[in-house]
């Protein structure tokens, strides 16, 4: 099974759009996405590589398992 690895922010951006999030705003280098059923926004820095911690934190907010995330990433590559 593939591992959760650091990821370029552009690929994570595509993932968020795939799961129904929309770009709300940007504050400095941080991109902020929202979805109507989420209690809080998805926030991540526009850095070359997002750490596993940032990805896992946002998956928790989205209520998406690591396995489901990896499955979706295989589809949108």
Task: Explain the meaning of each model-derived region.
Residues 1-30, 34-77:
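Basic nucleic-acid-binding interfaces
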């Amino acid at each position: 099974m593939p591992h959760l690895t650091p990821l370029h922010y552009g690929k994570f951006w595509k993932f968020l759009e795939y799961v129904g999030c929309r770009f709300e705003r940007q504050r400095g280098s941080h991109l902020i996405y929202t979805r109507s059923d989420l209690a809080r926004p998805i926030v991540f820095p526009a850095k070359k590589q997002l750490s596993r911690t940032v990805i896992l934190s946002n998956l928790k907010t989205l209520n998406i398992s690591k396995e489901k995330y990896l499955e979706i990433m295989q589809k949108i590559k």
